[in-house]
Curated annotation (Swiss-Prot):
Native source organism of the sequence: Kineococcus radiotolerans (strain ATCC BAA-149 / DSM 14245 / SRS30216)
Pfam families, A to Z: RNA_pol_Rpb2_1, RNA_pol_Rpb2_2, RNA_pol_Rpb2_3, RNA_pol_Rpb2_45, RNA_pol_Rpb2_6, RNA_pol_Rpb2_7
Reaction(s) the record says it catalyses: RNA(n) + a ribonucleoside 5'-triphosphate = RNA(n+1) + diphosphate
Keywords: DNA-directed RNA polymerase, Nucleotidyltransferase, Transcription, Transferase
The protein's assembly and partners: The RNAP catalytic core consists of 2 alpha, 1 beta, 1 beta' and 1 omega subunit. When a sigma factor is associated with the core the holoenzyme is formed, which can initiate transcription.
Family as reported in the entry's similarity comment: Belongs to the RNA polymerase beta chain family.
Lineage of the organism: Bacteria, Bacillati, Actinomycetota, Actinomycetes, Kineosporiales
Any one cellular-component term (Gene Ontology): DNA-directed RNA polymerase complex
GO terms (BP aspect): DNA-templated transcription
Enzyme Commission numbers on file: 2.7.7.6
Function, as annotated: DNA-dependent RNA polymerase catalyzes the transcription of DNA into RNA using the four ribonucleoside triphosphates as substrates.
Protein name: DNA-directed RNA polymerase subunit beta
Amino acid sequence: MEGPLLAASLPASAPNSTYIGNQSPRTVSGRYSFGKIHEPLEVPDLLALQTDSFDWLLGNKRWQDRVEASTNGGLAVPTTSGLEEIFEEISPIEDFSGSMSLSFRDHRFEPPKYSLDDCKERDLTYSAPLFVTAEFINGNTGEIKSQTVFMGDFPLMTDRGTFVINGTERVVVSQLVRSPGIYFERVPDKTSDRDTWTAKIIPSRGAWLEFEIDKRDTVGVRVDRKRKQSVTVLMKALGWSESQIREEFADYESMISTLEKDHTSGVEDALLDIYRKLRPGEPPTQEAARNLLDNLYFNPKRYDLAKVGRYKVNKKLGTEEPLSDSVLSVDDIVRTIKYLVKLHAGEVTMPGVKNGQPVDVRVEVDDIDHFGNRRLRSVGELIQNQVRTGLSRMERVVRERMTTQDVEAITPQTLINIRPVVASIKEFFGTSQLSQFMDQTNPLAGLTHKRRLSALGPGGLSRERAGMEVRDVHPSHYGRMCPIETPEGPNIGLIGSLSSYGRINPFGFIETPYRKIVDGVVSDEVEYLTADEEDAFVIAQANAPLDADSRFAEARVLVRAKGGETEFVPRDEVDYMDVAARQMVSVATAMIPFLEHDDANRALMGANMQRQAVPLVKSEAPLIGTGMEFRAAVDAGDVVVATKAGVATDVSADMITTSNDDGTSTTYKVAKFRRSNHGTAYNQQVVINEGDRVEVGTVLADGPSTDGGEMALGRNLMVAFMPWEGHNYEDAIILSQRLVQDDVLSSIHIEEHEVDARDTKLGPEEITRDIPNVAEEVLADLDERGIIRIGAEVRDGDLLVGKVTPKGETELTPEERLLRAIFGEKAREVRDTSLKVPHGETGTVIGVKVFDRDEGDELPPGVNQLVRVYVANKRKITDGDKLAGRHGNKGVISKILPVEDMPFLEDGTPVDVILNPLGVPSRMNVGQVLELHLGWIASRGWKIEGQPDWAKLIPEEIREAPAGSRIATPVFDGAREEEITGLLSSTIPTRDGDRLVGGDGKARLFDGRSGEPFPDPVAVGYMYILKLHHLVDDKIHARSTGPYSMITQQPLGGKAQFGGQRFGEMEVWALEAYGAAYALQELLTIKSDDVLGRVKVYEAIVKGENIPEPGIPESFKVLIKEMQSLCLNVEVLSSDGMAIEMRDSDEDVFRAAEELGIDLARREPSSVEEV
């Protein structure tokens, strides 16, 4: 049995590292791997999904290298780049007479104007100018004018697969759509017991063509989603005579009966009949009818099957048209009809051609949810489609200008208006459903976001319409889309994640690799298969036992055949074998150890919650990993990796310089305390020293949530499974005070606050220290410009940037005019519109950026200055925060106990976390218990004595390990239960010769409060615990007075608006039930929308008087106004029958408010827009 000793991690320079098989040096690490299966293939580049697609669109150097490699027998790569395809497609643009034409060729990019970091700092888009050679040909004179034309700035992808748009990182998600092609379906008829059979020809763009055989056995056709008509009418219109149809379809009753009901005679009659159905109300002429049909299906400008559509049509119908034929042919339509009637008649095959040889094509209905019929539109194609719409809008402009401009004066530059192209690209990146704000909580979140597959978006499904079938796991997802990782909620099953080994072929279908079996020997040769190719083969699992010659060890092998059915077959019938055990799951799921012991629902939560883990102050790689941690962290791009071999010559906190073996030197930047998209700290830390040797792929600096180049999302904590005084009831968690004191679970969060000074109608706003009516101590931390100093500690309400806005001038009195004349402008009225720290936020100012128009910074129109302040705060773990393991075991901290009260082991070590054992059995995520035990074994080290039975699969190299060893237990191929049981009895004892945890994984624990032992032994071990981004500080909220809604005058809702708590219908019933009338009256009036009353109450409280009577709530006045607007004359009567005048007594309100110096109406607006 070959078993790799060490699985994926640290660089090859790590001590004692050993190479295995054909793995490259960078996947070898200090992890002791319990994997038994030899993997012939490394996990491919995890970002290739994004980068390869974008390279194809641009046609850049990397793409050209791949094309060259493919001509030498590598992976098939499309030979024209995406932009080239579009410019070829649109060229030439001709005027209406065809005498002038404009064509495009040879696009090229200039270097970007700003660097990536500049773009992020200045809110710009990281893009490169695109130039195209445009040629104008005057057909009358034969004159050719050629020019290089600027086609706008084209956003560029960063090395990490993201785009920087207006200073923020965004990701374009790949879209899963139904592939163009022909689909045959069988639909049960609701009214009768007969089925209807349909065929749809779906193009990449253009009109659909649908055929159906109904319960009366007549064959109908729908052209462009309009009314149904006889299929024979369409055939006649395409030039078939009645006798030809009879001859071709003589054996099919359905066609003959359809033909007999069809009363059109000849081509003209049929064309006019179709025209009447498609364009009712327009006078039918033969010319118009022929044009209509030609434009619908035979005009390449209007109809496009795309290469993938032609490929699918050829495959389905058994034809061999060239892939460049992107329109339908009459033959395609006739063969489709033939296939449909054969399907209806119950025939199984029809004659076709493959590789020039006649073959029998299977006649069967299609499964729409099969991955052979769903393809991926990745970044390149999505942007290409967008550029195509922009160019076709531009085409219209060019045509118009050709006719209106003087022919002599025309140059390509005067014809072309690039605005529509630029606008459509901008629109896609800014507003498309598929261009998303990058999830940057931690590196895994970013990596998963880039590998996401979405069935939503333009041209895809919508949440409301998608049924159960589309969302369900399908056998063809195996190795292509992860069956585990998908959101909970309305998007379940519509958004997935690409499996670890999946890759995209040139047609957009997902392929997955298999080991080829040659003459009964499982070779290391790997073939990639698409979902419909795979259906033809018999495939064994990765864990099928092999003998020393790489043949199957057992006579019958468990395999899956077509349709995902599993069965045992003789070993000589197997065609392929899985490449790896983790082949079917995504990266995040492959990072859950003992996944094979977890229920799928909980594994789903575990995979999703790893993406919400906040980067901690000190990252720590898991004791129990799966061997995927290194590749995930490096491919996510958040660690700094050496690109050339050499020696580190200069190492500082934010820069590393290496002198390379080839005589060059490379400088690597290290990011310090930047703010991520989600407010977590993005901080990289150098891990090498000056003079260290580095190889290609050596990790030079760790990023957020990485440790030694491995993904490190949480901390290894000592956990005991036991109830404790009911404080861990229902998933609540008890923590030790040690985790607070030692900052074990502390994280740093950075908020960005921004204020701009604009020109207003009354004059410019000003950023200044000179603010009216503000005490000097409030301004203590502001510098002379009025901007807070770096290092200042701030809390809610503190000033960050002083700013004043001119107020509206009133008519001046003579005295004021005199003052104005003497003292100049100084006496002008200004309002304080300073930037203050929002409610509930505290921290330290760590950065200030000032952009000024006068110093040449590009700012939006009307803005003179822009100031950004970065406030960081360290959040220690506290009760109310949410923690989780990797197995979907989540909970909220209910109590933090002093260390001395925590249960402790026999040697006095207190545990860190107490979890409730009842959280395990009903949820069936037993993986957490195995992780706990193996974590204990790893922390203590082990030594296997003798040759016990349970250890026969454990390789010689990992028979012993020191304390604190990191372990890899790959998914579906990890440590077995008997191995864990055995190792528990083989851990290295303490100095006293004791093993604190017995062979059953349980320890004798003592109560920290009394020192008495607990009556039963308790399971204790190390578990990897994550702190999730659901922090109580972001959720807790309280309000006294604050903003009110304009119309109802009730407090706004929600923390963001500094709103109040809603006292709803049911709460009112509760108070009514108790008869608490006064409390209720107070809640509904003076605490809410009795405008006058609430001011008077404030006044009474301030002056220490009795609370006055409540008045009439504003919402009652609104109700009356609404009834009056419905022409109902409503009056309010007092108890003695007199009409009460419902007018607003504003004077009282303002008098009281002015006396008290309060503004109860709304918050002070902080920017001009709010004023």
